[in-house]
């Protein structure tokens, strides 16, 4: 199983370093913003194993409904984890 995790991590790293904003039709977006949004799509694809999910997430230069859903899904996942944490008092 660790080999699978390594391959997923490697593919995410390669996809982040190989793509540039103009490759997917994004103009007027900073490199930092592009990298942040692309990392979000990569995380979403990694966590939810969607076939072709990253392409749908990147569509319309990260302004489509799929990207927004991905962000909400990732944020909800983090919120659920926070709810289970008991205070240390």
Curated annotation (Swiss-Prot):
Q: Where is this chain primarily localised?
A: secreted
Tissue expression as described in the entry: Expressed by the venom gland.
| Classification via Gene3D superfamilies | Crustacean CHH/MIH/GIH neurohormone
Signal peptide interval: 1-18
**Top-rank lineage group of the source organism:** Eukaryota
GO CC field:
extracellular region
Enumerate the UniProt keywords alphabetically: Secreted, Signal
- State the compartments where it is located: Secreted
Q: Which InterPro entries match?
A: Crust_neurohorm, Crust_neurohorm_sf
Protein's name according to its UniProt entry:
Alpha-latrotoxin associated low molecular weight protein SGV242-280
Source species: Steatoda grossa (False black widow)
């Amino acid at each position: 199983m660790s080999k699978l995790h390594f391959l997923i991590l490697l593919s995410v790293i390669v996809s982040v370093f190989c793509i540039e904003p103009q490759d997917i039709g994004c103009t007027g977006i900073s490199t930092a913003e592009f990298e942040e949004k692309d990392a979000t799509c990569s995380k979403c694809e990694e966590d939810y194993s969607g076939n072709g999910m990253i392409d749908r997430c990147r569509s319309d230069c990260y302004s489509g409904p799929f990207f927004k859903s991905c962000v909400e899904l990732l944020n909800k996942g983090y919120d659920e984890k926070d709810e289970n944490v008991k205070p240390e008092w």
